């Protein structure tokens, strides 16, 4: 009996597999699942068992399987009870076929069939590697497939699986025609044999008592980290290289698939409450980046993005670090792929108009449609209320809130725990907190500067690259930052929104108002008295005065003189000098505290700044000039102080002169008395021909100047404090000195003067004339003009500064090609002041070709033009002092 059973087991058995039913579920828009039910139906002629592994490999290896139409083998009754549902869009009805072994087919039938060899492409098999197969039990129903299987007496167990994502996989049974032949490779047969062996070893592999064969179970390879299943071991190994084992992404995804119906019901309820059914958080926090990384200052909007950042950036594997970012990869292949993504991820989409780069084409299209780079005017959106034009829809919506009165309000939940300031969003709060912590994670790649925000880094890099994308529509001046352009536009419109509540003065910037408010606040108060000060240094100096007054002193009983210590008092008592003069308390010499008030407005572009240091930076960077050339920091008193010139007199008449000096420290006049008991206040040398008396005003008192006897040819002594009546003061000019015009004048003069000139020796033809006060002032201005316009090496060739101003000025004019001998007779008849004025006119018209100076000469006197070119610095500083006091 045993030998007979073994003989039966060794016989090859025909395996019949029926594809009873193929259902196609209508695909949805997002996900198109295809559900197929497979059934293994074994032959019911006699109970059979699977042949051994070795026999099957030797008998079936390399065999071909033919698909025959079931109409030949199945009775018509079964055909009537079958389902009439279409299998696919390409097939009209479901056909049931039988798959028989090639060895059991009659040769005559084989020749009658048309066969076609089809080679299955490997990519289609690989597509199913990443889908999870889940067994689903189907309830008993009275279908045609059940009736067929009931006749054979087999149990029913259906395995259904869903093909996710957007890949559409069409079942092979619906796409093949009847009688087609499939070529099965050796690798596939070995995998099928392994599956059959595992099925035979399983407890449910055979059930001899019941007489029914159990359904074959598909054995999958499961990832032990994320619990994802695979049909092949090679697919599992590839998956392990990319598996994000430290995140719960796969677990949550598998849980969602198991409880899909429950999640959909819960999602409908949560959607009404504005809560996401996936993360159970409010939709208000989706765009806020509320998930912060504990290892770096980055924040993320979703949990998935955060987990991906943790896996890539803060991974524990350090064998293959990325040279571009901080990511650490597991293998060299992954590192190469990661670095290629860096290159391809750059910003491949660029705007052809402004050159701005984008990572996605959608961002570029949005930029081209809703920005100033739009080619069509129809892309702009205007407000229906005020007709204001916008390029982006979100900007228009925020603008409409101003009309509706529903402006965005700072939320208290975004409050800084340090300074208690509230912000609109969590991202702005995170940037603000870095100002307290001092954290600056963004480094500039062009300098050593670090910034606290990425937006600030982008603005900072524009100063290195010279990019100025924002230009003024009025004056065409370009700016690197849009905020600076908005502030600049207020100069054209005259808008000054920041107004001081104390004095009513308005400013363009809030920083200017804060600086100005310090003049009214005086926050530093003295504890010993009621005085208040603007700065802490002023308070410290004031406190020192209090401490100095509290110092102990020792006084003399006879003269009431005070001393700091007993040694000085004893020395005073031993000397015995108790006179009234010695008893007086010595007056402390007052310190000459000269306060230098520097200007804060640019002399070239009329811009105002908060401090002089900011103005200096502006002059260096924008105008490329030396700030000291634009405005000086020398004290006004030092500029007003001038050295009195000693007049040249003959030795015979030297005794007749009465010297008079002015004591600047005491402020009083040192006078001398004449023979007729008259007080000589000041002597002035006047021309002999002028016999009339002149009146002068000296320190608010009027004095009479009498002519001296004798002929004295010398220069007249003048002082700034003396003002001669009857003379016209020059008209006031604007305090803003145009530095650019000075530079152009100096360049023109330097180009006009030749370097290789032979200068004659200094002559004394210009001496011996009596100069008036106006002539002396003109002479001094011409000397300044020569120093300012000409270079020192060139002036040194002309004998400057030892040579007279008139001679140097004439040599400069003659060297430029103008012959002064033509009008020598006319110039000889003029006095000193008239000659120098004519020479200056020739200097500005012949030597220096400047249209603006020529226009000034047509409208103003030459003296005013010279002062305009030089710049009245004293008047500028006085105006700055008055502006600061206001």
UniProtKB/Swiss-Prot annotation:
SUPFAM superfamilies from the UniProt entry: beta-beta-alpha zinc fingers
Sections of the chain in a coiled coil: none
Keyword Phosphoprotein tagged: no
ZnF C2H2-type span: 221-243, 291-314, 320-342, 349-367, 381-403, 414-436, 442-464, 470-492, 498-520, 524-546, 554-578, 600-623
Region (Disordered), start-end ranges: 24-62, 167-211, 571-594
UniProt keyword terms in alphabetical order: DNA-binding, Metal-binding, Nucleus, Repeat, Transcription, Transcription regulation, Zinc, Zinc-finger
Disulphide linkage map: none
Gene (UniProt): su(Hw)
Gene Ontology molecular function terms on file: DNA-binding transcription factor activity, RNA polymerase II-specific; RNA polymerase II transcription regulatory region sequence-specific DNA binding; zinc ion binding
Main function: Component of the gypsy chromatin insulator complex which is required for the function of the gypsy chromatin insulator and other endogenous chromatin insulators. Chromatin insulators are regulatory elements which establish independent domains of transcriptional activity within eukaryotic genomes. Insulators have two defining properties; they can block the communication between an enhancer and a promoter when placed between them and can also buffer transgenes from position effect variegation (PEV).
Stored SMART domains: ZnF_C2H2
GO cellular component: nucleus
Record-given protein name: Protein suppressor of hairy wing
Bias (Acidic residues) ranges: 184-201
Localization: Nucleus
Taxonomic lineage from the root: Eukaryota, Metazoa, Ecdysozoa, Arthropoda, Hexapoda
Biased composition (Basic and acidic residues): 571-587
Record flagged with keyword Hydrolase: no
UniProt xrefs under Pfam families: zf-C2H2, zf-C2H2_6
């Amino acid at each position: 009996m045993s030998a007979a059973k073994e003989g039966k087991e060794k016989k090859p058995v025909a395996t019949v597999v029926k594809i009873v039913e193929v259902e196609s579920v209508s695909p949805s828009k997002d996900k198109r699942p295809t559900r197929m039910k497979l059934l293994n139906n074994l032959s019911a002629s006699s109970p059979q068992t699977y042949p051994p592994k070795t026999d099957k490999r030797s008998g079936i290896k390399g065999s071909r399987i033919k698909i025959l139409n079931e109409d030949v083998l199945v009775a018509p009754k079964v055909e009537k009870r079958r389902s009439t549902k279409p299998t696919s869009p390409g097939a009209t009805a479901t056909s049931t076929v039988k798959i028989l072994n090639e060895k059991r087919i009659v040769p005559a039938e084989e020749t009658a069939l048309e066969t076609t060899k089809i080679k299955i492409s490997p990519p289609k098999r690989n597509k199913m590697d990443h889908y999870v197969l889940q067994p689903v039990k189907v309830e008993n129903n009275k279908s045609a497939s059940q009736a067929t299987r009931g006749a054979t007496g087999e149990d029913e167990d259906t395995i259904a699986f869903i093909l996710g994502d957007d890949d559409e996989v069409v079942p092979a049974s619906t796409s093949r025609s009847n009688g087609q032949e499939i070529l099965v490779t050796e690798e596939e047969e070995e995998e099928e044999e392994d599956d059959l062996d595992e099925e035979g070893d399983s407890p449910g592999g055979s059930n001899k008592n019941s007489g029914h064969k159990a359904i074959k179970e598909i054995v999958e390879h499961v990832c032990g980290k994320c619990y994802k299943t695979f049909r092949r071991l090679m697919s599992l190994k590839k998956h392990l290289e990319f598996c994000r084992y430290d995140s719960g992404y796969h677990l949550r995804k598998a849980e969602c698939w198991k409880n899909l119906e429950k999640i959909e019901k819960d999602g409908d309820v949560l959607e009404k409450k504005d809560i996401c059914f996936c993360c159970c958080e409010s939709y208000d926090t989706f765009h806020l980046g509320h998930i912060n990384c504990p290892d770096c200052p980055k924040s993320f909007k979703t949990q998935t993005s955060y987990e991906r950042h943790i896996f890539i950036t803060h991974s524990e594997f350090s064998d293959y670090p990325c040279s571009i970012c901080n990511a650490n990869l597991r293998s060299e292949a992954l590192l190469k792929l990661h670095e290629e993504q860096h290159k391809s991820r750059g910003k491949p989409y660029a705007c052809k108009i402004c050159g701005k780069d984008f990572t996605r084409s959608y961002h570029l299209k949005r930029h081209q449609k809703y920005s100033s780079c739009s080619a069509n005017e129809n892309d702009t959106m205007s407000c229906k209320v005020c007709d204001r034009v916008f390029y982006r829809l979100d900007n228009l919506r925020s603008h409409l809130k101003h009309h509706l009165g529903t402006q965005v309000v700072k939320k208290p939940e975004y409050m800084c725990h340090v300074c208690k300031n509230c912000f609109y969003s969590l991202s702005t709060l995170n940037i603000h907190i870095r100002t307290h912590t001092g954290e600056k994670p963004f480094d500039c790649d062009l300098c050593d500067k670090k910034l606290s925000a990425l937006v600030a880094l982008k603005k900072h890099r524009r100063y290195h690259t010279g990019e100025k994308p924002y230009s003024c529509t009025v004056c065409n001046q370009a700016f690197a930052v849009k905020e600076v352009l908005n502030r600049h536009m207020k100069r054209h419109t005259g808008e000054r929104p920041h107004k001081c509540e104390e004095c009513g003065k308005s400013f363009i910037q809030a920083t200017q108002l804060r600086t100005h408010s310090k003049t009214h606040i005086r926050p530093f108060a003295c504890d010993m008295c009621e005085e208040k000060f603007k700065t802490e240094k002023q308070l410290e100096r004031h406190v020192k005065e209090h401490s100095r007054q509290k110092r102990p002193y020792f006084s003399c009983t006879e003269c009431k003189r005070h001393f700091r210590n007993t040694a000085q008092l004893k020395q005073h008592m031993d000397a015995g000098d108790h006179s009234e003069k010695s008893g007086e308390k010595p007056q402390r010499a007052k310190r000459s505290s000269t306060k230098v008030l520097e200007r804060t407005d640019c002399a070239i572009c009329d811009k105002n700044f908060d401090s002089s240091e900011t103005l200096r930076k502006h002059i260096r960077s924008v105008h490329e000039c030396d700030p000291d050339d634009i405005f000086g920091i020398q004290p006004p008193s030092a500029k007003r102080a001038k050295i009195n010139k000693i007049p040249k007199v003959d030795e015979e008449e030297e005794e007749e002169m009465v010297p008079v000096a002015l004591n600047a420290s005491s402020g009083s006049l040192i006078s001398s008395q004449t023979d007729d008991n008259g007080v000589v206040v000041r002597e002035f040398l006047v021309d002999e021909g002028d016999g009339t008396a002149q009146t002068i005003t000296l320190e608010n008192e009027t004095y009479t100047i009498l002519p001296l006897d004798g002929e004295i040819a010398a220069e007249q002594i003048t002082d700034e404090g003396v003002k001669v009546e009857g003379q016209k003061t020059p008209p006031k000019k604007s305090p803003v000195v145009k530095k650019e015009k000075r530079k152009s004048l100096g360049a023109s003069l330097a180009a006009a003067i030749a370097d290789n000139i032979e200068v004659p020796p200094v002559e004394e033809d210009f001496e011996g004339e009596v100069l008036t006060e106006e002539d002396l002032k003109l002479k001094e201005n011409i000397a300044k003009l020569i120093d300012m316009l000409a270079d020192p090496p060139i002036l040194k060739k002309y004998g400057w500064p030892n040579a007279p101003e008139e001679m140097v000025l004439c040599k400069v004019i003659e060297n430029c090609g103008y012959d002064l001998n033509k009008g020598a007779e006319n110039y000889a008849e003029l006095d000193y002041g008239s000659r120098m004025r004519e020479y200056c006119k020739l200097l500005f018209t012949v030597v220096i070709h400047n249209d603006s100076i020529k226009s000034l000469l047509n409208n103003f006197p030459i003296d005013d033009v010279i002062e305009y070119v030089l710049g009245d610095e004293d008047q500028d500083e006085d105006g700055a002092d008055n502006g600061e006091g206001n």
